[in-house]
Amino acid sequence: MKKPLVEIPTVDALAYNLYDSRALICPIMDARRSQVYTGIYRFQEHKLVTVEAQMAVPMAEMIEKLNARGEEVVFLGDGVPVFGKMIQENLKVPYSFAPAHVNKQRAAAVAALGGIYGKEGKVVTAMEHVPEYLRVSQAERERAQKLQEEKASEKNS
């Protein structure tokens, strides 16, 4: 339990697939309900830099953010086939889609980032590790709503 552990956010690893890209990098993973798990990244001096941290947002909101930045962007991830048409119709800045061979998670990118983050001291123990969920699951939302309704009915009784 005291072994060192390096946490690698999924969208960071996906962005790292486009090592040394000159454009902004926008990984998009389909989160259902017109939302994506995403972030905005760039490479500076061969280093992945987070422009906007990972988040779960409606794809329309992400398009607005990217239009406001006014920079070229490259998209990758399983959200590309889902939201490609929406991007084509609404994005006003130059954009492209990553080639198929780097469009999905790759163990090599996770390992490379693990080495970098480890050298930077971004290490925790297994006991300290807490998964970071960007959105509450549907089951958790429904359970919370049910508990809230039960409390309300108890107050009214």
Model-assigned labels for residue ranges:
Residues 3-104:
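Surface "functional belts" at beta-alpha junctions
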Residues 96-157:
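Acyltransferase
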